[in-house]
């Protein structure tokens, strides 16, 4: 297994895992909103909010993080033989925290900068609070999807390694 192959496998599995995470987030939001508004309105919840650009930027950042951190995970799991469950969990946590941190700056720039010097604390409101809540609600999904991601990365690495040796 070369480093390039390990990174490619990790990147692909990272992007698949991020896609799964985004689908789960969409499903959760649909369920929460559809209880009051109906399924169609719940499914298209993002069309009725003022911060859709923040969601879009967050999704793009999350995909980039999935690619970048996935490469790191591929190297750690397939080359260095780290524990795939722990590595997957830590990488999953890194993806959601990095995404939250950078996506939060969108709201800070849009609204928070105007509140600097007032009684409001824009850094706390736009950076710290999202980090806190994503950590609280994202810990268990990061563990589950991260472990699944680590297992798939390890499995794909074994499949790739086995086909190269003629097994």
Residue ranges and their predicted role:
Residues 1-167:
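Juxtamembrane/disordered regions of integral membrane proteins
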């Amino acid at each position: 297994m070369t480093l390039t192959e390990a990174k490619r496998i990790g990147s692909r599995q990272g992007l698949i895992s991020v896609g799964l995470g985004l689908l789960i987030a969409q499903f959760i939001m649909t369920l929460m909103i559809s209880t009051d508004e109906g399924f169609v309105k719940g499914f298209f919840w993002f069309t009725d909010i003022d911060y859709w650009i923040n969601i879009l930027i967050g999704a793009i950042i999350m995909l980039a993080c999935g690619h970048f951190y996935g490469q790191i995970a591929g190297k750690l799991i397939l080359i260095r033989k780290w524990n795939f469950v722990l590595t997957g969990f830590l990488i999953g946590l890194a993806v959601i925290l990095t995404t939250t941190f950078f996506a939060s700056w969108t709201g800070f720039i849009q609204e928070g900068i105007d509140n600097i010097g007032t009684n409001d604390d824009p850094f706390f409101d736009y950076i710290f609070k999202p980090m806190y809540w994503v950590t609280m609600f994202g810990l268990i999904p990061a563990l589950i999807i991260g472990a699944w991601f680590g297992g798939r990365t390890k499995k794909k690495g074994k499949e790739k390694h086995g086909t190269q040796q003629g097994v």
